[in-house]
From Swiss-Prot:
One Pfam family, short name: cobW
Keywords assigned by UniProt, alphabetized: Chaperone, Cytoplasm, GTP-binding, Nickel insertion, Nucleotide-binding
Species this protein is from: Stutzerimonas stutzeri (strain A1501)
GO molecular function (one): GTPase activity
SUPFAM superfamilies cross-referenced by the UniProt entry: P-loop containing nucleoside triphosphate hydrolases
Gene Ontology CC entries for this record: cytoplasm
Principal location: cytoplasm
Positions with a binding annotation for GTP: G12, P13, V14, G15, S16, G17, K18, T19
Function: Facilitates the functional incorporation of the urease nickel metallocenter. This process requires GTP hydrolysis, probably effectuated by UreG.
Name of the protein this chain belongs to: Urease accessory protein UreG
Record-stated family: Belongs to the SIMIBI class G3E GTPase family. UreG subfamily.
Length: 204
């Protein structure tokens, strides 16, 4: 049994699909692992309420943090509000295997504090254009896993997945990335496999 849960940080711009991915991960992993979630919103608990409404987990396993300012600060420079939520979940559910920390919508420069997150997943979406990977920034270049989401929209926005693939390889070097469409679960198994392997999770 893990003494401390694996903490997976999910970041990315507003509307990229972070909450949809968090929901999909909860639904896929909740029967395998002792799991909880912390969400970040600036002035509301909208993402937490979305997860509760969609029965991602039991409501008491989801804590919504209102950051009241720049979402970047709450996951990086002053992560205390998130660290307290993580500690609260640890006290509430001894023996947690995994805590997902979903950041508020942020910009390309946002990163998670190492104090808060053991693994980081950064989600971007195709509708922002195929130039996004080459814009770089810590989320795109340094996250443990980059998820390029909403690939079904590529034809509608004139985005080339080949260009995104090439640029992601160039910007990330050896770091992995996944193309996904969370509406139909495409790419989800690869993301889960990455979390389990890199986080050394073993199902009960």
């Amino acid at each position: 049994m893990n003494t401390q849960p694996l903490r997976v940080g999910i970041g990315g711009p507003v509307g990229s699909g972070k909450t949809a991915l968090t929901l999909a991960l909860c639904q896929a992993l909740r029967d395998r692992y002792n799991l909880a979630v912390v969400t970040n919103d600036i002035y509301t608990q909208e993402d937490a309420q979305f997860l509760v409404r969609n029965e991602a987990l039991a409501p008491e396993r989801i804590i919504g943090v209102e950051t009241g300012g720049c979402p970047h600060t709450a996951i990086r420079e002053d992560a205390s509000i998130n660290l307290e939520a993580v500690e609260q979940l640890n006290r509430r559910f001894p023996g947690l295997d995994l805590i997902i920390v979903e950041s508020g919508g942020d910009n390309l420069s946002a990163t998670f504090s190492p104090e808060l997150s053991d693994l980081t997943i950064y989600v971007i979406d195709v509708s922002a254009g195929d130039k996004l990977p080459r814009k770089g920034g810590p989320g795109i270049c340094k996250s443990d896993l980059l998820v390029i989401n909403k690939i079904d929209l590529a034809p509608m926005v004139g985005a080339s997945l080949e260009v995104m693939d090439r640029d992601a390889r160039k910007m990330r070097g050896e770091r992995p990335f996944v193309f996904s469409n969370q509406k139909v679960g495409q790419g989800l198994e690869e993301i889960i496999s990455f979390i389990e392997k890199q986080g050394m999770l073993s199902a009960a």
